[in-house]
Amino acid sequence: MIDPNLLRNNLAEVAEKLKVKRNFMLDTEKLTALEDQRKNLQVTTENLQAERNARSKAIGAAKARGEDIAPLLAEMDDMGNQLTEAKAQLDAVLAEINQIALSIPNLPADEVPLGKDDTENKEILRWGTPRTFDFEVKDHVTLGEEANGLDFAAGAKLTGARFAVMKGQIAKMHRALAQFMLDLHTEQHGYLETYVPYLVNHATLYGTGQLPKFGEDLFHTLALQGEQPYALIPTAEVPVTNLVRDVIIDEAELPIKMTAHTPCFRSEAGSYGRDTRGLIRMHQFDKVEMVQIVDPDKSMEALEELTGHAEKVLQLLNLPYRKVLLCTGDMGFGSCKTYDLEVWVPAQNTYREISSCSNMWDFQARRMQARCKAKGDKKTHLVHTLNGSGLAVGRTLVAVLENYQNADGSITVPEVLRPYMGGLDVIGK
């Protein structure tokens, strides 16, 4: 949620930025009308409350003098009814303003390039050189099936499309990748490992911005009797970031760096017909997520650090990748600046997204009321939150299988993974 003071004091400027940079049309007339109503009702309730307090004192004085206070009590009751009605109207207006505010995307940072879609993203760097093969390249589906380690038919039988079963050495490599990532982030990058629920409530989803706008992208549970409804997490960013919801953090404890390995569940609404073959776009996939809670003055610096942590995974696996700064038209709803890392996928002869690292500024913190303050200081201020994939495990498996394949269909195990696989150096044939 963007700063409400910006909407009150710089509405026209904010609306223009949202139109140009986000292709988002803010209904300024409606918002202005609601703001006028809010101000009027605020004054009305404050005046009624002040008058009611004054009348209450007058009743006390009249009673002490032995006067008949029945007429005064009747006036108080009437004033109380007026106050209750005015407060209800004010609450309704505030709720409507809040619903509009929840639908507004974050404002991009000034350095984010203007653009309509991913064709206008800005490439920052490339690392590594794509391998030249002297044999016909197989895709990860063929490699995995030939190794008897990927079974999409079983996934479809058990559940449906966009699900897979992994077995044997492929399943072991998938697990090894996640363990390697967690160890790297906790032992070298300073993150605290967390284990979090895979089901979250709606307040949690509002906190990080999935609701109310992206409800169709989630898998929702039916509420049991006496229970609130839940949704499966689309990313560990949701529960991990919400650990600081409604918390006032001592500034001395910042930055807070947390990581988690979880399955992620996405409906992939709007992705019909895209990446229907293989592990690239699944309803269920594993990801190691990194989250940072930082001082507002240090969030851009933290974004560079966090992105570097994701890059380190790719570098240690010796997987060629490129780093891309997303343009305004390709950014996520809550982000003010995002880098994507795209790994080389030989069978597709292109780079594919494997990590997205974002500075959310105070957008999520305002929704969550996640604040910090210096020791001895009474005033609090919102923290900044960042998140990034470090990495998507299934897509990393895709990249390893295809980049490390051999002519006989076997796959060489990257050196950094061998300790996690009992010293195994080749899988497959």
Curated annotation (Swiss-Prot):
Top-tier EC class: ligase
Domain notes: Consists of two distinct domains, a catalytic core and a N-terminal extension that is involved in tRNA binding.
EC number: 6.1.1.11
Species of origin: Haemophilus influenzae (strain PittGG)
Family: Belongs to the class-II aminoacyl-tRNA synthetase family. Type-1 seryl-tRNA synthetase subfamily.
InterPro entries hit by this protein: aa-tRNA-synt_IIb, aa-tRNA-synth_II, aa-tRNA-synth_II/BPL/LPL, Ser-tRNA-ligase_type_1, Ser-tRNA-synth_1_N, SerRS_1_N_sf, SerRS_core, tRNA-bd_arm
Highest taxon above the source species: Bacteria
UniProt-listed SUPFAM superfamilies: Class II aaRS and biotin synthetases, tRNA-binding arm
One annotated GO molecular function: ATP binding
GO cellular component: cytoplasm
Primary site of residence: cytoplasm
Positions of L-serine binding: 235-237, 289, 389
Description of how the protein assembles with itself and partners: Homodimer. The tRNA molecule binds across the dimer.
This protein's record includes keyword Membrane: no
Record-linked Gene3D superfamilies: Bira Bifunctional Protein, Domain 2, Serine-tRNA synthetase, tRNA binding domain
Protein name, UniProt field: Serine--tRNA ligase
